[in-house]
A protein has these predicted regions:
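A beta-strand signature from Gram-negative outer-membrane beta-barrel systems
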Residues: 25, 72-113
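Extracytoplasmic beta-strand/coil segments of soluble accessory domains associated
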Residues: 18-62, 79
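Predominantly transmembrane beta-strands of Gram-negative outer membrane beta-barrel pores used
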Residues: 52, 80-84, 100-106, 113-122, ...
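Hydrophobic, lipid-facing positions within transmembrane beta-strands of outer-membrane proteins
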Residues: 39, 97-99, 112-116, 126-130, ...
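Short acidic/polar hinge/loop motifs at secondary-structure boundaries
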Residues: 40, 58-85, 173
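N-terminal periplasmic "start-of-domain" segments of outer-membrane beta-barrel proteins
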Residues: 1-10, 40, 81
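Transmembrane beta-barrel strands of outer-membrane/channel proteins
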Residues: 116-120, 144-150, 190-196, 247-253, ...
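Flexible loop and strand-edge segments within Gram-negative outer membrane beta-barrel domains
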Residues: 151-172, 180-243, 251-271
């Protein structure tokens, strides 16, 4: 397992998860579609559908979020990244064929009380981040993450009259709660995230509200609204540290409305995931075993038409 900690992330700081692998030779991040700006991860010669991409061991970039999900996690939220090459364990999902990428988000109990930054580049990207954490008492703590970015500068360095990078804007809000009782062995996390993302690609001068149903310009617009909730509970037996059990549950609703030229494509993806694990030993700590149960449910509603 390769661990990318906060010090390693500082060497090549990225605005989001898709830009956080610059210093790691095990992973290639490429544009699978230059026109729409879709990024795809490749590991051991296989691409994203064969990778398990999780957030704190809960699958997150899958289904409807496969195309743009890597850009939905801001870089300032990331505490560390764990990379497993090759076929991985099915403990947290069955999709790890080429490998697993797990992202750890900053914890309320250990995060900075206050963090704020602004970013602007000559490529027209502007970004703002706010993070605040509060310890309510010795057991409870909470944190609030707010991220916003804007890309409104048209760039066409190769003079082909098409945008080199998508225009867009994103608002991302995350609220986390943490409960820790070390004496009794209980740890719990709860979170809710709301995200709104808008992207526009196509020819220079394309204005969706004017040119959508005309032949003067070709363009595309992808609007995404997403909600994620999760609950994690763990218990370690105080006198038997090798013995523990954990429960994870997550729900997400991904609504995407898009058009590509005259073709409309809308998708509504609802996903539920649950996981129960029990860890212990046989005889001594050299012989360990894990028992568990995974359940996942996906509901897709897709609409494709010509207008």
């Amino acid at each position: 397992i390769i661990n990318i900690n906060s010090e390693e992330l500082l060497k090549a700081a990225g605005c989001n998860l898709s830009e956080s692998f610059e210093t790691n030779p095990s992973i290639d991040v490429n544009f699978s579609d230059a026109l729409t700006g879709t990024k795809q991860i490749q590991m051991l010669g296989l691409t994203s559908p064969y990778l398990l991409i999780s957030e704190e061991n809960i699958p997150i970039v899958r289904g409807a979020s496969q195309a743009y999900g890597l850009t939905f996690t801001p870089g300032t939220w990331i505490e560390s990244i764990q990379i497993t090459k090759g076929t991985g364990s099915v403990i947290n999902g069955f999709e790890s064929i080429a490998g697993q990428i797990n992202t750890e988000i900053k914890k309320p109990f250990s995060s900075d009380p206050l963090f704020f930054n602004l970013f602007s580049s000559n490529m027209g990207r502007r970004e703002a981040n706010f993070q605040g954490s509060l310890k309510l008492n010795n057991k409870w703590s909470t944190s609030l993450f707010i991220h916003g970015n804007l890309r409104n500068q048209e760039i066409d360095n190769n003079s082909d009259s098409f945008l080199d990078t998508p225009l867009g804007e994103q608002v991302n809000i995350l609220n986390r709660w943490q409960y820790t009782d070390l004496k009794k062995g209980w740890v719990g996390f709860g979170s809710i995230r709301l995200m709104q993302d808008e992207k526009q690609v196509g020819e220079l001068g394309f204005m969706p509200e004017i040119h959508r149903y005309e032949n003067f310009f070709w363009g595309s617009q992808i609007n995404t609204a997403r909600i994620d909730t999760s609950l994690k509970i763990g218990y370690v037996f105080p006198e038997l540290s090798y013995k523990s059990f954990g429960f994870q549950s997550a729900y997400s609703n991904h609504i995407q409305e898009a058009f590509y030229g005259f073709r409309n494509y809308d998708i509504d993806h609802q996903s539920f995931y649950s996981n129960i694990l029990y860890n212990s030993i046989i005889g001594n700590t050299k012989n360990k075993f894990k028992l568990g149960f995974n359940f996942s449910y996906d509901r897709y509603l897709e609409t494709v038409d010509l207008s």
